[in-house]
Amino acid sequence: MAAAALSRTLLPEARRRLWGFTRRLPLRRAAAQPLYFGGDRLRSTQAAPQVVLNVPETQVTCLENGLRVASENSGLSTCTVGLWIDAGSRYENEKNNGTAHFLEHMAFKGTKKRSQLDLELEIENMGAHLNAYTSREQTVYYAKAFSRDLPRAVEILADIIQNSTLGEAEIERERGVILREMQEVETNLQEVVFDYLHATAYQNTALGRTILGPTENIKSINRKDLVDYITTHYKGPRIVLAAAGGVCHNELLELAKFHFGDSLCSHKGAIPALPPCKFTGSEIRVRDDKMPLAHLAIAVEAVGWAHPDTICLMVANTLIGNWDRSFGGGMNLSSKLAQLTCHGNLCHSFQSFNTSYTDTGLWGLYMVCEQATVADMLHVVQNEWKRLCTDVTESEVARAKNLLKTNMLLQLDGSTPICEDIGRQMLCYNRRIPIPELEARIDAVDAETVRRVCTKYIHDKSPAIAALGPIERLPDFNQICSNMRWIRD
């Protein structure tokens, strides 16, 4: 539901590139702009409902070719503008898996109008940043610049997605870069575990493949593959031009018409359908007793962005929460699981997640444990899941709802996260959901709703499990599945 909010609780699933001042820098996802509240300060779960004030309207216009233009003008001196494209690794097959990510790498390697050096110098002289990332269902290119440079930023974005040269020399050079990136990803155990989790949960489907693709594909992708991907997927109805900050919607609309009105023709045939991705309860275990800690993810099948149960699962996700040893401990932690984990010294950290795609999702927990506590930690996690289905209280749900709303609003801080929120929501829902509407949907969730929805998705369901490290004491899959069942009143 809250596309921007959800992404903060998810584990890494996108690969980004940031260009600014001619060097690459990592960019973490931030969130959107400050929001103002009326009424007294929120002091407890019984506090009066808050009213969001001074939220600029999100204006949306659709061009004749299907491209949607959406913007929010907050009067800042800077702006973020970008292209959100309904195309990612899920639209690939086994042979071309990795093409979307490869294409993202090629975006800033020169166009028919600008060499790579010219592009870097122009961005540097503007004091701007160019960014791109690929996820399983979306590809994004965006720029952050001064508001006065909005026309130049839009023109550059249009140039790089429509006129990239895709030179053979650049392709070969980037091939090596991606292979080195794959080696770096393999050292990030959290990403490795989540790739394993997708591979086992969505076996032999597009969501089960990695975003980077297998090594053999990276070594064989050629210019024709990249051009074919652009021709198939970079079409008007599948693209959103989103902007936030100091932007005028009418100006943005005219820029969109000028740069995209004729070039991005609409589909002559049907838009390629999303390949169905069936969830399979199963596991992947990679035992390595030389590793100091065990890394484990367990998840059940959840729902897509627009499903009515999404909000309730977000609240349940907040109820489970997250914890790290650096947080300290005590019985006043908001998460019951955090209290038990801290008191029993069961793990180094855990993080709940609710990953939503168009028509499916993963709801679960990622944990890092000592070898001796893996079984105990998993047992406590499953007991907490059971408690969500049977014994969660109204006060706990009220606290989780307030925490969820607070986190969502705190994430909306700046033009870049607002722009990301607009772009994602336009692709997911074809509109930007107003914050008051989202708050009302969260407020409608009560303890009975949480118990009912969690029972629907957790009770007697076979989970997907990915485990890496010293996992000798991890219970076998049948035992884990049996612990997903309990006697209900």
Swiss-Prot record:
What is one Gene Ontology biological process annotated in the Swiss-Prot or TrEMBL record?
protein processing involved in protein targeting to mitochondrion
Which Pfam family is one of this chain's hits? Answer: Peptidase_M16
Entry's localization field: Mitochondrion matrix
Positions that bind Zn(2+):
101, 105, 181
* Annotated SUPFAM superfamilies: LuxS/MPP-like metallohydrolase (SSF63411)
Q: Which PROSITE patterns does the entry link to? A: INSULINASE
The keyword Protease belongs to this UniProt entry's keyword annotation: yes
Give the enzyme class.
hydrolase
**Protein function:** Catalytic subunit of the essential mitochondrial processing protease (MPP), which cleaves the mitochondrial sequence off newly imported precursors proteins. Preferentially, cleaves after an arginine at position P2. Required for PINK1 turnover by coupling PINK1 mitochondrial import and cleavage, which results in subsequent PINK1 proteolysis.
Name the lineage. Answer: Eukaryota, Metazoa, Chordata, Craniata, Vertebrata
Q: Which catalytic reaction applies to this protein?
A: Release of N-terminal transit peptides from precursor proteins imported into the mitochondrion, typically with Arg in position P2
**Organism encoding this protein:** Mus musculus (Mouse)
Which Enzyme Commission number(s) are on file for it?
A: 3.4.24.64
Q: Which GO terms describe its molecular function?
A: metal ion binding; metalloendopeptidase activity
How might one describe the regulation of this protein's activity?
Answer: Binding to PMPCA is required for catalytic activity.
Question: How is the subunit organization of this protein annotated in UniProt?
Answer: Heterodimer of PMPCA (alpha) and PMPCB (beta) subunits, forming the mitochondrial processing protease (MPP) in which PMPCA is involved in substrate recognition and binding and PMPCB is the catalytic subunit.
The annotation note on the cofactor reads:
Binds 1 zinc ion per subunit.
Query: Which residues constitute the signal peptide according to the record?
Result: none
**What is stated as this protein's family in its record?**
Belongs to the peptidase M16 family.
Which GO cellular component terms, listed alphabetically, does the Swiss-Prot or TrEMBL entry include? mitochondrial inner membrane; mitochondrial matrix; mitochondrion
> Which cofactors, if any, are listed as required?
Zn(2+)
- Residue(s) at site: Required for the specific determination of the substrate cleavage site: 191, 195
Which superkingdom heads the taxonomic lineage of this protein's source? Eukaryota
Spell out the protein name for this chain. Answer: Mitochondrial-processing peptidase subunit beta
Identify which residues the record assigns to the active site: 104
- Where exactly is the transit peptide annotated in this entry? 1-45
Keywords associated with the record? Hydrolase, Metal-binding, Metalloprotease, Mitochondrion, Protease, Transit peptide, Zinc
